[in-house]
Amino acid sequence: MTENTHHDPAALDKLTEPFTVLPNDNPASDEKRQSLIDKPAFGQVFSDNMTHMTWTKGEGWSDRRVEPYAPLKMDPGASVLHYAQECFEGLKAYRHADGSTWLFRPDANAERFQNSAKRLYLPELPIDDFLGSVAALVKRDANWVPSRREYTLYMRPFMFASEPFLGVRAPQEVDYCVDRKSVV
């Protein structure tokens, strides 16, 4: 998947090990998925699954999972809706000549994500958790990565203050997710 872990299955497994993979009872059919890949529409089509984890001030990062793509439940008082405490990154998954899926320098994305979080008083996501969340989703939704050389699959890691709280302070509860957009 990355230049450092692609040829080392043990390293990749170690990164994805903390993530529980939940069943998806309604994935896109092969035919539907292929038709969506063949006609890219950036930001309008999403893959079958997403990664999700939570952070609380008392417990830190927990509940690492790959789950079916679905709307997020959010309290109307969530801090992100009132104070815009949110950050995101973007990276692309592409099909390598040998059929494997690779990402370009995801460690650099992880470092930028940490810096963005720090500036917004959000908790810094450990680099291994960032890489593990992306790797777990790549493994689960590998069939969404196009085989045509000119196409890639865009991945969007994002974090937001999900705690229902109106006031100015660092959040006590945060959600982090990675979803995959259509081919670009």
Go through the PLM ranges and name each one.
Residues 1-184:
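Conserved alpha/beta cores of soluble small-molecule-handling proteins
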